[in-house]
Amino acid sequence: MYPQLLLFFRSRDGESAEILKGVLHHQRTHRPWSISLHGDEQVGTDSSWLQGREWHGVIACNASPLFIEASSKLLLPIIDLSDSSTEYGVSKIRPDNIAIGHLGAEYFIDRKFRNFGFCGYSNLSRSNERREGFVEALELAGKHCTAFEVEHPDAVTPVWESKQIGLLAGWLRSLPEGTAIMACDDFCAQRVICAARTAGLTVPEKIAVLGANNDVIQCELGEPSISSVAINAYEMGRRAGEIMDRMLAGEGQFPVDVRIEPQGVVTRKSTDILAMRDKNVAAALNYIQEYACQGITVDQVLERAFMSRSQLEHKFRRFVGRSPQKEIRHAQVAKIS
């Protein structure tokens, strides 16, 4: 008889789909399970529902703390995939939020930004961890950050949304032109872009915005599309399947807090600009970024930079730290990888 596994996923967004793919890939290549997939709110909040069937294990994403606690008290093997701090001693698999913040800061630094901001929610642990990583990486590079943080309500209302857009717009107006802002997630990034529009600030020319999680639908819905740090949701699911198999086999100790490294940054329109004091160098760099893999030459770059070859060489070494030819190669390698 196959083990009976309950998979509870309240949301069916892109992240959840990737996690499920990872779980199912492990299951199909290892010990088979009998799986029940549920997303009903009652299943995730009503702990008595767990007693209705003889489950052998639970993998849950965004279930209530009551549900997680009840599963633990029933001595069910359980893996919690919610992106919050560890509770009840159960095995938790989640993104490495500190690393996500680090990656966001490094991305902006590489693109030559000099002013930085973070937007998030003070009562969400993942937001706080991402801010901590972002600020830490900036400080290691000798740079500083200003933050805009509010408490996120249990239920978002139109009144709350409108108020936040207004407050955000005021904060954005107070920032230096060309500030690079990391938002704690893609939904927050969308709010920042709406607030920038309210403030009369164009994205990415006046304000660059980077999200996190890389929810493709959310990132592609608006204009401009949102650049985002991509978490490795598939690997989260694969590791969940691996650890669940060990639990079902009766192995002893299991990791309590597994953190999965992000995959990288997916660049879209909201950050697709290089912050350079020299506008001609910025134009040349943007041209290289866009056409590096199409066999462009330094002569073609010169046509966009409106300067002599010697001036271009001098300014690239000053602002970029590489010659134009090496920058073309660097951009080619970055796109391939």
Positions of predicted regions on the chain:
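Bacterial carbohydrate/catabolite-sensing allosteric modules
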Residues: 1-57, 66-306, 313, 334
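Terminal helix-turn-helix DNA-binding modules in bacterial transcription factors
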Residues: 299, 318-337
